[in-house]
From Swiss-Prot:
SUPFAM superfamilies: Ribosomal protein L25-like. Part of the 50S ribosomal subunit; part of the 5S rRNA/L5/L18/L25 subcomplex. Contacts the 5S rRNA. Binds to the 5S rRNA independently of L5 and L18. The keyword rRNA-binding applies. The gene is rplY. It comes from Syntrophobacter fumaroxidans (strain DSM 10017 / MPOB). One of its GO terms (cellular component) is cytosolic large ribosomal subunit. Keywords: Ribonucleoprotein, Ribosomal protein, RNA-binding, rRNA-binding. One of its GO terms (biological process) is translation. This is Large ribosomal subunit protein bL25. The keyword Ribosomal protein applies. Belongs to the bacterial ribosomal protein bL25 family. CTC subfamily. HAMAP family: Ribosomal_bL25_CTC (MF_01334). It comes from the Bacteria.
Length: 199
């Protein structure tokens, strides 16, 4: 599915013009990248809100059409940062990063767990420690999920990034020793074992 958004160039900056944009249901934005000049933009608030809701936590390429001075130019971008008012929860600003399609980038990709762990069947608890992992890939090859098979995970065991590197078809850039998911003993199990040993 193509994800598209139309932005307008803007020449005025500062708090006053930014507030005026928000009153008109527009969100101030900026476009930048390694091969592009920084451009100030504005985007429709409702369209941005719907787009972010549909995207969820996934890092996806966005087709941003930049309109201004009677011209329109399409850019391939990622959303790098969205600033939200801490109380009113309205959008304050958004950063778009223009990506060269032939240059690898690092993005955050959500983790998806597959299967029921052996340890859970024994009464243990499954803990997802890292909900997102860093992936290096070309912009057109961003995976939707990092799938992790946890069916063989027993109580007291974990799966680390290093173990996933031999399984997934893309590069993981997080520390190899970082635990992604584990299964822990049921609460109170250690106490019960100690009491049984004393008896």
């Amino acid at each position: 599915m193509d994800i598209e958004l139309v932005a307008q160039t803007r020449t005025k900056s500062g708090k006053g013009p930014a507030r005026a944009l928000r009153r008109n249901e527009m969100v101030p934005a900026v476009l930048y990248g390694p091969k592009a000049e920084t451009v100030s933009l504005s985007v429709p608030r409702q369209r941005l809100e719907r787009l972010l809701r549909d995207m969820g936590e996934e890092s996806k390429l966005l087709r941003l059409t930049v309109e201004g001075d009677g011209t329109a130019e399409m850019k391939q971008v990622l959303i790098r940062e969205v600033q939200v008012h801490p109380v009113r929860r309205r959008f304050l600003h958004v950063d778009f990063y223009e990506v060269p399609l032939d240059h690898p980038i690092v993005v955050e990709v959500p983790v998806e767990l597959l299967g029921e762990p052996v340890g859970v069947k024994k009464g243990g608890t499954l803990n997802l420690i890292q909900r997102m992992l860093s992936v290096r890939c070309l912009p057109g090859e961003i995976p939707e999920k990092v799938q992790v098979d946890v069916s063989k995970l027993d109580i007291g065991s974990s799966i680390q990034v290093e173990q996933l590197r031999t399984i997934v078809p893309f590069e993981l850039t997080d520390d190899g020793g970082m635990a992604v998911v584990n299964v822990v003993a049921p609460e109170g199990a250690g106490k019960e074992d100690a009491e049984a040993a004393e008896e």
